[in-house]
Amino acid sequence: MSYHNGSIWPHDTTIVALGMRRYGLIEPFLTLTTALFEAVRHFPGYRMPELFCGFARRSGHGPTRYPVACEPQAWSAGVVFHLITGVLGLLPAAAENRLTLDRPLLPAWLKWLELHDLRLGKSRVALRAAQGREGAAIELLARDGDVEIVVRR
């Protein structure tokens, strides 16, 4: 058990995952995304800690907690939101009043995902992403304002 040697830092792991997504390394991105979502289920209140131990997985057990990790940790609390941004490829452009979803996809275990009251400038939207043949199918559920929604495949 070590603070810097072999521990998992969710914030840093997410930065790596998003870099993989950006450069088209989809399978490694999804592997890290899935691992982080699986890990967070085991922490009280779904609060992602600052770090946890990088020991091998054991069937039926969650990650080994690092005894003095900050929990919750501000930068780790943002991990889930960053990963959602990554899977949907959210690229907000408030100055242009446009929200682009760049190659949206969902991990195999996530059949659908809804975002409500997503704000862009003075506009608000609600979206639903569902498993599709070529990435995630996007449905606009609600729009308040004149924000343009662009889905790039």
Q: Which role does the model predict for each range below?
A:
Residues S2-L110, E114, L118-A126, A130-G132:
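C-terminal capping/lid segments that line or modulate ligand- or cofactor-binding pockets
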Residues L99-P104, L115, A142-R153:
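Surface-exposed beta-strand/loop patches in extracellular or lumenal glycoproteins
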Residues P72-G78, L140-I149:
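Short, highly charged low-complexity linear segments
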Residues V125, G135-R143:
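Short, well-ordered beta-strand segments enriched in hydrophobic/aromatic residues
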